[in-house]
């Protein structure tokens, strides 16, 4: 097993004394150096000792939740239950990720609530990731370029995967599309060997010429 990247200190959480701060034992990433304090965990089962994943600020990962890969938590974010956070995921603000939610790619910030069997993931075509912010709630599955804002809700059982580079904005009362590239009139290329038909103009005879 690789050398441990963090240890659990004796610094207890002010409200949940069974949670303790972590401390980096080596440089983890550019903004996390050896000796830096991080957020709170319940045990080493909450944060992988491998990769560049990290819990910063006053963020909490507890119960059976697990953070791994390159995921980053900060501010007062809370991950609990059996939730799993990985990949290029960024979780901040007062976000709560719980139950069996899985985030493999996404940016979450604000008073967001992600629970149930929710999933956030990157689209396999564009690599785009969803953004969930402000007071949005997600119970369903989102992939690709989305921005879910304000008090919008993605209901359970809903799966939306955006395979385009356009950003789909979902608010509580509206859906809007932000086009990444200017739309131009399409230019069509003729198939190989195509020859346009020659049109023959027939002169209409005057009635006097028919006599």
Where are these regions (language model features)?
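Feature marks extracellular polysaccharide-active and adherence modules
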Residues: 56, 62, 68, 74, ...
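Terminal amphipathic alpha-helical/low-complexity segments used for targeting or macromolecular assembly
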Residues: 1-52, 58, 70, 76, ...
């Amino acid at each position: 097993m690789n050398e441990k990247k963090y240890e659990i200190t004796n610094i207890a959480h002010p409200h949940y004394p069974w949670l303790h701060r972590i401390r980096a034992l080596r440089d983890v990433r550019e903004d996390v150096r050896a000796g830096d304090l991080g957020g709170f965990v319940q045990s080493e089962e909450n944060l992988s000792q491998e990769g560049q994943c990290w819990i910063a600020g006053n963020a909490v990962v507890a119960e059976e939740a697990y953070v791994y890969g390159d995921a980053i938590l900060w501010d007062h974010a809370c991950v609990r239950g059996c939730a799993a956070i990985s990949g290029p995921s960024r979780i901040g603000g007062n976000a709560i990720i719980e139950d069996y939610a899985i985030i493999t790619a996404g940016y979450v910030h604000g008073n967001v609530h992600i629970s149930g069997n929710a999933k956030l993931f990157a689209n396999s075509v564009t690599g785009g990731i969803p953004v969930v912010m402000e007071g949005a709630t997600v119970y369903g599955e989102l992939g690709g370029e989305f921005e879910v804002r304000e008090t919008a809700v993605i209901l359970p059982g809903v799966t939306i995967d955006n395979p385009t580079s356009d950003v789909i904005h979902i608010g509580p009362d509206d859906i809007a599309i932000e086009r990444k590239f200017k739309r131009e009139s399409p230019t069509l290329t003729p198939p190989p060997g195509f020859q346009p038909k020659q049109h023959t103009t027939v002169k209409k005879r005057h009635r006097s010429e028919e006599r």
